[in-house]
Regions:
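Short coil/turn connectors at secondary-structure junctions
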Residues: 98, 109-114, 143-145, 173-178, ...
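Acidic/histidine-rich catalytic neighborhood of metal-dependent amide-processing enzymes
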Residues: 154-226, 273, 278-282
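Residue-level signal for inorganic ion chemistry
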Residues: 27, 195, 296
Length: 312
């Protein structure tokens, strides 16, 4: 017996794999970028309510003052698209322009508050429609050019819904409260802050996040106690005199120097300079300012476990 589970003799979650597959393919087919995930939110909320869960959405989920990187025009267009796709107008109105969802399942017994976080947004890339790819052959490839779940958030959201379904069915064997958070706008590190500011993680005894990967074997998981795939975005400005000397040279040197920073020997790290911008007005007048858009990502050391989950 642990502080969250009364018994280890519990049904195999593999029995819910058909539900998982259906959710994942539905989300993969209709990808939406950060802060525009209205169809995805409807899919999540509909599934949770079908389980009998009470769901939190809209301003009860998001702190507007903490929102970053939200394009109002894209949000408005996404709402119109969702309405055309069959999402009820009353539901869209209730969201008040905010995406994402959360639910807390109470077992009715004392125990910890365990929070699971799952992302729902996609990446702005086009999916290959070449025959031979599973999504193409089975008919669930992205229907939206320029948008794709290439980072696996369709599987993350489907995992969250499947786990919520299992917890709901087995709550009599569990203790405490289990909260499921379906986060919008994870790409670009934009959505989490607004949810944390609203209190979604407050009082949590355990906070779990997860990410799929192809670098480990079937039935194997790995875990880290913190910092895994942590990322940071940095904007750097270089200023100089508007003469034949140029800030571009300084920016270029900094770009190369960043790549020479030694990587951590016990983990994985990446540094990417994604944008370089100059404000030159004349060909002869060299840029006086150069702007860097940088991102860093790192993975802390982790442990591996084998699992006994059987295939469907």
């Amino acid at each position: 017996m642990t502080d969250t589970c009364l018994s280890r003799d519990l049904p195999d979650i593999a029995d819910d794999l058909p539900f998982f597959t259906d959710c994942r393919r539905r989300l993969h087919r209709r990808p939406e970028e950060g802060w525009t995930e209205f169809e995805s939110t409807w899919t999540v909320v509909s599934a949770l309510k079908a389980m009998g869960c009470e769901v939190v959405t809209g301003a009860d989920l998001i702190e507007p003052e903490a929102v970053m990187g939200r394009d109002a025009a894209k949000v408005e267009a996404a709402q119109r698209r969702a309405l055309e796709a069959g999402v009820p107008e009353a539901f869209l109105t209730s969201l008040d322009g905010w995406t994402g969802a959360a639910t807390t399942i109470d077992t009715g017994r004392p125990g910890p508050l365990t929070v699971f976080r799952f992302e729902i947004d996609c990446v702005c890339v086009s999916e290959s429609l070449e025959p031979g790819r599973l999504p193409v052959d089975l008919g669930f490839a992205s229907e939206r050019p320029g948008l794709m779940h290439s980072c696996g958030h369709d599987m993350h959201a489907a995992t969250g819904l499947t786990l919520a379904r299992w917890v709901t069915a087995n709550r009599d064997a569990l203790c405490g409260r289990i909260r499921f958070v379906f986060q919008p706008a994870e790409e670009g590190v934009r959505g989490a802050k607004a949810m944390v500011a609203r209190g979604l993680a407050r009082g949590a005894d355990y906070l779990w996040t997860q990410h799929i990967t192809t670098s480990i074997h079937e039935n194997e998981i790995f875990a880290s106690a913190g910092g895994f795939l942590a990322t940071e975005k940095i904007d750097i400005s270089f200023h100089g005199s508007s003469e034949f000397g140029t800030a571009v040279t300084a920016a270029a040197h900094a770009t190369l120097a960043m790549q020479a920073i030694p990587r951590h020997s016990e983990g994985a790290s990446r540094i990417c300079v994604g944008t370089l911008e100059a404000d030159a007005e004349k060909a002869r007048s060299r840029p006086t300012r150069r702007r860097h858009g940088c991102a860093s990502k790192c993975a802390a050391p982790f442990r591996r476990w084998r699992t006994s989950c059987r295939r469907a």
